[in-house]
Amino acid sequence: MIFEIIKIGSQPINFAYPIPLLSLLAFMLSGSGYNELIISYIFAFSFFTAANLWNHLNDAEDDLNAGRNYARFLIEHRKIVTEFVVAFYFVSFLLIFFISKSKEIALLLTGLSVVLTWLYSDKIFIGKIIRRFKEDYKTEVFTYILCSFSFPLSFWTIFSEISQVGVVFTLATGFTYLSGFFLKDLKDISADIKSGYRTLAVVLSPSTLLIISVMLFIASTFVVIFSSLLDVTPTSSLLVLTVYPPILFAIYKFHKEKWKITKNIISSLKIYTYSYLGFLIAFAIGCKL
């Protein structure tokens, strides 16, 4: 049972968990030890397992109707899974409380992330009183903007006190995560309409979502480029420029199709998506050259 719970909690994949890129980037940028590297990944594992499990649990009925087999497991073990969610969130708090090098602000930011991700998904408890945040684009965007920056900043405090370098880390990874959020909404359009949600995927056109995603991703690269030119991060972090050829190629293909989501840009979307990983890897390697 525990293995199944952890497996479900690892979806969807992101660059903090189960992919350990956020930990590796912070490790290389901060120059901290391996203890911080390991603890940061445990923190990411705890937080994202809780947030993902809670989201899947609240969507279990809809997911079961959509043919997702894991949903039946969640429905049958709703109480136990809820207890695991609370436990994993609690572990996140404990790690920050004992390990963070800027404890007060990190606890505040972690608490903010926990509350927002809970309200984002919840329709079992508080969601019976107020509309859960994921069902309306205003609260959806509010949640993602705050969590995209509050989580990496609290994450950074495992490695070091808040500093200019920590702010660069937060902005670069935050804009990247936000970019992926707008891209993710593209695949949720039909499901959100069917469920009666007013999410970004419903109120904005697919073309607009794609354009915003690209702009945010470019913003994340600019953060690293300017921080390098201003000597906040190593000059070698300009290695992130190597991701521009695939990004520009993808943008060219998107523009050629007038930013419409067609089968002609599927391969370009894959290239664009892999550029996220390329950017973070290049940033991490550049910090050590």
UniProtKB/Swiss-Prot annotation:
Signal peptide span: none
Highest rank taxon of the organism: Archaea
Topology of the protein relative to the lipid bilayer: Multi-pass membrane protein
Localization (cell): Cell membrane
Membrane-spanning intervals of the chain: 13-32, 37-59, 80-99, 104-121, 141-160, 165-183, 203-225, 235-252, 265-287
GO MF, one annotated term: transferase activity, transferring alkyl or aryl (other than methyl) groups
Main localization category: membrane
Keywords on record: Cell membrane, Membrane, Transmembrane, Transmembrane helix
Any GO CC annotation of this UniProt entry: plasma membrane
Protein name listed in UniProt: Uncharacterized protein AF_0771
Species of the source: Archaeoglobus fulgidus (strain ATCC 49558 / DSM 4304 / JCM 9628 / NBRC 100126 / VC-16)
